[in-house]
Amino acid sequence: ETVDHQLTSSVANLETLASNRRDFMAQYLAAPREAVVKGAEGPVRAWILAPGKQPDRADRLAALLRDEGIEILRAASPVKASGLRDAWTGKTLAMDLPAGSFMVPLDQPAGPLARALLDPHVPMEAGFFKEEREWLERGKGTRIYDTTAWSLPLLYGVDAYWTGTKPAGDWKDERTQEARGSVAAADPVFGYLF
């Protein structure tokens, strides 16, 4: 029965998509362009991930973001930056970012995804909190689940900052390099395939 319902739902979705394909394609093509504009004009223009005391964590977080299609830049040399907002405290700082720091510009097609993964605050409407209180008072339990992992810089323990202006500096594009395999021995007798 469950599979039948899933099939019915999938077919209905495909039929709706097919009959509205022009509108869907227009929205599909417009969304990345709108994300670039919104990222260039919004109050948060970039996220900075500094190596800090545990640079491997910043490296792993940057790799995760790249794997999700988010564009990352890396400082080839130290960068002077001001107007940075600390993700942990919210304080505004000016600092010298060390070489190896990452910048996640938000004027990119994946800007909204970057914000969703990096922002430390998840805004909720006041009406939601009123409904939540009513649910709790009626003994229905909470509808909120753990939000501590919603901000990846906080989850990874990375020194992270957001800024309304992208810091000028020698930033290099950080694209994921595809791993290339090869056989190291000249005349192997046997090998393993994983």
Where are these regions (language model features)?
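Intrinsic-disorder/low-complexity accessory segments
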Residues: 1-194
